[in-house]
Amino acid sequence: MIAHWDEVAAERDLGQAAGALNVGLRRLELTPGDTVEQGDPGAEEILFVLAGSGSSQDRRGTGSPVRAGDCIVRHVQHTGHSLRAGDNGLTVLRFVGPLARRPNLDDKLPPPSIANLGGVAADYEGDAGKWVVLARQAGAVRTGLNWGRLEAGHAGAPPHSHSADEELFVILEGSGTVELWPSPEAAKQMERETHEIRAGHVISRPPSTGISHFLRAGEEAMTFLAYGTREPNDVCYYPRSNKIYWRGLGLIARLEPLDYDDGETED
């Protein structure tokens, strides 16, 4: 459920180390002049530049400069793309989504695109912190990457769990806690848990666990990336308020939890 990038071998997938099922994450540290090729073209890929500078190159060798705070999206079936480190090296997080249907050659695919954190308007900015929907601005379709900052003592999204979406959180700065809230059925097997988290921690939340998650900053502000798949059939449950969100229907409703045998007659 939680892994720290300093405690995971460089060649190992950080997402898998944290318990991810269908998504991947690697931290790439490139020395000046190093190049890393695009991964599987059957999966949407999102890269976030943590430090340094370099260029994102297409199969024709045309390069676009990249720098810290850049979010780069490479769509399904794009091939031959690479990332090259400049004179200061390059540190990048590479998120890889689940394998998708390979589009027909006639499908209209946007080219790989880049959005910088400093150039994207925040969806929310206030006393609790700041929230930037980042990868969507760079053209992501099947997955998403958001940047968040929680001010000291403040919490993020309310406790929730997904039926189909898978999420990864990467703590970039500061520290805090992640709380795990079991659904009524899961509560028969476990109690609510709280885990300490800090910069470098990767938190995995696979789908259909029946266990909700909840982030809160500690005595200092906490900055993090939130990555997730975007499944149209996902159902999201909010245990604190007993709400259900059907994304594909655009509907949020409150339900009454019941036991399996509630209302049934004995034969």
Q: Where are each of the predicted segments found?
A:
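A short, N-terminal "cap"/entry segment at the start of jelly-roll beta-barrel domains
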Residues: M1-G24, A100-G144, A152, Y237-D267
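Conserved short histidine dyad/triad with adjacent acidic residue
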Residues: R26-P41, N146-H162, G210
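Residue-level "contact hotspot" at macromolecular interaction interfaces
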Residues: E29, F48, T62-P65, R149, ...
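Short beta-strand His + acidic residue motifs that chelate non-heme Fe in jelly-roll/DSBH
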Residues: E37-Q38, S56-Q57, R74, G80-D87, ...
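Glycine- and acidic-residue-biased ligand/ion/polar-headgroup-sensing regions
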Residues: A43-R59, A164-E166, V170-T177, W181-P184
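Short acidic-glycine-tyrosine-enriched beta hairpin
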Residues: R60-H78, P182-P207
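A short hydrophobic beta-strand segment most commonly corresponding to one strand
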Residues: V73, D87-R102, S204, F214, ...
